[in-house]
Amino acid sequence: MERLKKVGDVKARNSSEIKSSPIGLGFEKLDRGLFDPEKAYDKVAKLGVKWIRIQSGWARTEKVPGVYEWEWLDSIIDNLIRRSLKPWVCLCYGNALYTPAAGEVFGAVGCPPIATETERNAWHRYVAALTRRYAGRVELFEVWNEPDGVWCWKHGPDGGEYGEFVKATAAAIREGNPAAKVVAGAVCMRDLGYLNDMLATGAGKAMDYLSYHGYWPDELEKADRVRAYRALCARYNPAIRVIQGETGVQSRSDGAGALREGAWTPRKQAKFLARHIIADLFEEVSFASYFSCMDMIEALN
């Protein structure tokens, strides 16, 4: 086989020059203040990507019962929109005001507010207030992050339990903004049984999109997996579309992340990005998001 020969360069275009694109990037972990987004906004806009995934940070927003401090999230969303980027919001995580266990975990990661009526009602109020506030600015809202992993559902993943959470959260999303779209899943474990249990609760009828996280070294694995997701969703709601919500590696061998054991370099990272984004688009996902805009210093979700 002859090796490919470079014949030229693709000129980069700013996001403001692009009306729409199926390529996105992650701004995850700002709910825990783990990096300064001011250093990233302009650089990301120059990439020409469109969709930017952010996490809503309930614990950072509601520190006093019933009082929402939106300023930090306002700044992020407004800065993205000002640069012609499209934020979509992952609704997470828990809040120690209502779930005591959430106070023992950094960022309340993995502590869903589902055990008591007080927790459920507080979550409903928060979600409805958030979607109402960002109506006209944010279209897509995702229900939690990687609920099929024990790190994000600490008392033990349960597809049926998550399905009920999806239905309740979808109702809150649409109470705040009837035009909003609901993204559910954010699945990472390739367990179709879990996904079926979730959909069997009736959650599929409340969803517009299924999101998945494709941390697979070989991008060729994606085709069968995405087709399986589509086929399963079609049993419950043929209108569900698919989003690739996270995939990616760091640029160095001592980093953190799902595929941290690779001997990564910036060149290898770039090759991984190109292969995986192309594979996602080949499967006609609605859009594909790369994790993330920077190398993370730790592996918290």
Language model features by range: what are they?
Residues G248-N301:
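Aromatic/acidic polysaccharide-binding cleft in carbohydrate-active enzymes
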Residues L34-E38, V64, W70, D74, ...:
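Active-site cleft segment of glycoside hydrolase catalytic domains centered on the general acid/base Glu
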Residues L4-D31, V226-Q269:
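Mobile, glycine- and charge-enriched loop segments
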Residues K29-D31, W58, Y93-N95, P147-G149, ...:
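Active-site-proximal loop/turn and secondary-structure-junction residues that shape catalytic pockets
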Residues I81, R174, L281:
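Anion (oxyanion) recognition and catalysis
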Residues S20-G24, K50-R53, K86-W88, E139-E142, ...:
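Structural preference for beta-strand elements that scaffold enzyme active sites
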